[in-house]
Protein backbone atom coordinates (compact mmCIF):
# COMPACT_ATOMS: atom_id res chain seq x y z
CA UNK A 1 0.00 0.00 0.00
CA UNK A 2 0.87 3.67 0.08
CA UNK A 3 2.33 3.64 3.60
CA UNK A 4 4.71 0.77 2.83
CA UNK A 5 5.72 2.25 -0.53
CA UNK A 6 6.39 5.65 1.03
CA UNK A 7 8.40 4.10 3.87
CA UNK A 8 10.51 2.11 1.40
CA UNK A 9 10.96 5.13 -0.88
CA UNK A 10 12.10 7.37 1.98
CA UNK A 11 14.37 4.69 3.49
CA UNK A 12 16.03 4.19 0.11
CA UNK A 13 17.20 7.80 0.18
CA UNK A 14 19.41 7.11 3.22
CA UNK A 15 23.00 6.45 2.07
CA UNK A 16 24.23 2.91 2.69
CA UNK A 17 20.76 1.43 3.23
CA UNK A 18 19.63 -1.61 1.25
CA UNK A 19 15.86 -1.46 0.66
CA UNK A 20 13.62 -4.01 -0.98
CA UNK A 21 9.88 -3.56 -1.58
CA UNK A 22 8.24 -6.90 -0.79
CA UNK A 23 4.71 -8.00 -1.67
CA UNK A 24 2.72 -11.12 -2.48
CA UNK A 25 1.31 -9.42 -5.60
CA UNK A 26 3.68 -9.48 -8.61
CA UNK A 27 1.82 -6.46 -10.06
CA UNK A 28 3.45 -4.31 -7.35
CA UNK A 29 6.78 -4.74 -9.18
CA UNK A 30 5.72 -1.95 -11.56
CA UNK A 31 5.17 0.41 -8.63
CA UNK A 32 8.56 -0.53 -7.16
CA UNK A 33 10.24 0.11 -10.51
CA UNK A 34 8.57 3.52 -10.83
CA UNK A 35 9.87 4.38 -7.36
CA UNK A 36 13.36 3.14 -8.23
CA UNK A 37 13.17 0.29 -5.71
CA UNK A 38 14.11 -3.36 -6.08
CA UNK A 39 11.09 -5.67 -5.75
CA UNK A 40 10.70 -9.21 -4.47
CA UNK A 41 7.84 -11.56 -3.84
CA UNK A 42 7.77 -12.55 -0.18
CA UNK A 43 9.16 -16.03 -0.89
CA UNK A 44 12.14 -14.52 -2.77
CA UNK A 45 12.92 -11.64 -0.39
CA UNK A 46 16.37 -11.05 1.03
CA UNK A 47 16.74 -12.51 4.52
CA UNK A 48 18.70 -11.19 7.50
CA UNK A 49 17.48 -7.59 7.39
CA UNK A 50 18.45 -5.39 10.34
CA UNK A 51 15.09 -3.63 10.12
CA UNK A 52 11.91 -4.90 8.50
CA UNK A 53 9.10 -2.38 8.06
CA UNK A 54 5.75 -4.14 7.80
CA UNK A 55 2.72 -2.18 6.59
CA UNK A 56 0.43 -4.63 4.78
CA UNK A 57 -2.23 -4.83 7.48
CA UNK A 58 -2.27 -8.59 6.96
CA UNK A 59 -1.30 -10.89 9.86
CA UNK A 60 0.43 -13.27 7.43
CA UNK A 61 2.63 -10.38 6.31
CA UNK A 62 3.70 -9.76 9.88
CA UNK A 63 4.46 -13.46 10.28
CA UNK A 64 6.63 -13.25 7.15
CA UNK A 65 8.40 -10.18 8.55
CA UNK A 66 9.57 -12.29 11.49
CA UNK A 67 11.32 -14.66 9.07
CA UNK A 68 13.03 -11.84 7.16
CA UNK A 69 14.69 -10.15 10.13
CA UNK A 70 18.29 -10.84 11.11
CA UNK A 71 19.44 -11.98 14.53
CA UNK A 72 18.44 -9.25 17.01
CA UNK A 73 16.70 -7.43 14.16
CA UNK A 74 13.74 -5.10 14.54
CA UNK A 75 10.34 -5.43 12.92
CA UNK A 76 8.63 -2.05 12.77
CA UNK A 77 4.89 -2.70 12.56
CA UNK A 78 3.04 0.13 10.81
CA UNK A 79 -0.22 -1.74 10.21
CA UNK A 80 -3.50 -1.06 11.98
CA UNK A 81 -5.50 -4.15 12.91
CA UNK A 82 -8.25 -2.54 14.98
CA UNK A 83 -9.85 -5.22 17.14
CA UNK A 84 -8.57 -8.09 14.96
CA UNK A 85 -6.53 -10.68 16.85
CA UNK A 86 -3.20 -11.32 15.13
CA UNK A 87 -1.67 -14.78 15.60
CA UNK A 88 2.13 -14.70 15.74
CA UNK A 89 4.59 -17.60 16.05
CA UNK A 90 6.51 -16.15 19.01
CA UNK A 91 8.20 -19.43 19.87
CA UNK A 92 10.03 -19.87 16.59
CA UNK A 93 12.34 -17.33 14.93
CA UNK A 94 11.01 -14.51 17.08
CA UNK A 95 12.44 -16.15 20.19
CA UNK A 96 15.56 -17.82 18.80
CA UNK A 97 16.70 -14.71 16.88
CA UNK A 98 15.90 -12.36 19.81
CA UNK A 99 13.77 -10.16 17.55
CA UNK A 100 12.28 -6.84 18.56
CA UNK A 101 8.71 -6.06 17.51
CA UNK A 102 8.02 -2.34 17.66
CA UNK A 103 4.80 -0.55 16.80
CA UNK A 104 4.51 2.74 14.97
CA UNK A 105 1.52 5.03 15.09
CA UNK A 106 1.59 6.64 11.67
CA UNK A 107 -0.95 9.25 12.75
CA UNK A 108 1.17 10.73 15.52
CA UNK A 109 4.68 11.61 16.59
CA UNK A 110 6.12 10.06 19.74
CA UNK A 111 6.35 12.44 22.70
CA UNK A 112 10.13 11.92 22.79
CA UNK A 113 10.45 13.40 19.28
CA UNK A 114 7.54 15.84 19.31
CA UNK A 115 9.43 18.83 20.72
CA UNK A 116 12.17 18.70 18.07
CA UNK A 117 9.99 20.20 15.33
CA UNK A 118 6.72 22.12 15.37
CA UNK A 119 3.65 20.80 13.57
CA UNK A 120 4.28 23.37 10.81
CA UNK A 121 7.91 22.25 10.48
CA UNK A 122 6.89 18.58 10.25
CA UNK A 123 4.21 19.38 7.67
CA UNK A 124 6.64 21.44 5.56
CA UNK A 125 9.19 18.62 5.68
CA UNK A 126 6.57 15.99 4.74
CA UNK A 127 5.32 18.08 1.81
CA UNK A 128 8.87 18.66 0.57
CA UNK A 129 9.56 14.91 0.71
CA UNK A 130 6.37 14.27 -1.27
CA UNK A 131 7.44 16.70 -4.02
CA UNK A 132 8.96 13.97 -6.17
CA UNK A 133 7.41 13.04 -9.51
CA UNK A 134 8.19 9.35 -8.94
CA UNK A 135 5.56 9.30 -6.19
CA UNK A 136 2.87 9.93 -8.82
CA UNK A 137 3.02 6.16 -9.40
CA UNK A 138 1.09 5.80 -6.13
CA UNK A 139 -1.89 7.75 -7.51
CA UNK A 140 -4.28 5.19 -9.00
CA UNK A 141 -7.22 7.48 -9.71
CA UNK A 142 -8.60 10.99 -9.47
CA UNK A 143 -12.10 12.42 -8.95
CA UNK A 144 -13.72 15.78 -8.23
CA UNK A 145 -14.76 16.51 -4.64
CA UNK A 146 -18.42 16.66 -5.63
CA UNK A 147 -18.34 12.93 -6.45
CA UNK A 148 -16.86 11.96 -3.09
CA UNK A 149 -20.02 10.43 -1.49
CA UNK A 150 -20.59 8.03 -4.40
CA UNK A 151 -16.87 7.46 -4.84
CA UNK A 152 -16.40 6.34 -1.23
CA UNK A 153 -19.01 3.62 -1.74
CA UNK A 154 -17.32 2.51 -4.97
CA UNK A 155 -13.78 2.50 -3.55
CA UNK A 156 -14.83 0.57 -0.45
CA UNK A 157 -16.70 -2.15 -2.34
CA UNK A 158 -14.91 -2.73 -5.65
CA UNK A 159 -11.36 -2.64 -6.98
CA UNK A 160 -10.45 0.41 -9.03
CA UNK A 161 -9.91 -1.67 -12.16
CA UNK A 162 -6.15 -1.45 -12.01
CA UNK A 163 -4.22 -4.69 -11.47
CA UNK A 164 -3.03 -3.48 -8.07
CA UNK A 165 -6.31 -2.04 -6.84
CA UNK A 166 -6.58 1.42 -5.33
CA UNK A 167 -3.43 2.73 -3.70
CA UNK A 168 -4.21 6.43 -3.43
CA UNK A 169 -7.20 8.07 -5.07
CA UNK A 170 -6.67 11.83 -5.47
CA UNK A 171 -9.58 14.20 -4.83
CA UNK A 172 -9.65 17.48 -6.78
CA UNK A 173 -11.05 20.38 -4.74
Q: Predicted segment positions?
A:
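N-terminal Rossmann-like NAD(P) cofactor-binding module of classical short-chain dehydrogenase/reductase
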Residues: 52-53, 76
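Conserved acidic E/D residue at the C-terminus of a beta-strand in Rossmann-like folds
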Residues: 23, 54, 105
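Glycine-rich phosphate-binding loop and adjacent beta-alpha segment
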Residues: 63-128, 170-173
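Beta-loop-alpha module in the N-terminal Rossmann-like domain of NAD(P)-dependent dehydrogenases
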Residues: 56-64
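C-terminal hydrophobic helical "lid"/dimerization subdomain
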Residues: 117-173
Amino acid sequence: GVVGCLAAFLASRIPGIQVELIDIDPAKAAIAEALGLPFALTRDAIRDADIVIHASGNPMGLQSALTLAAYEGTILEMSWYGSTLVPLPLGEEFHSKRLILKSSQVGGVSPARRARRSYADRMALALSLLADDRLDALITGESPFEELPELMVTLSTTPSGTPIGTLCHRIRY
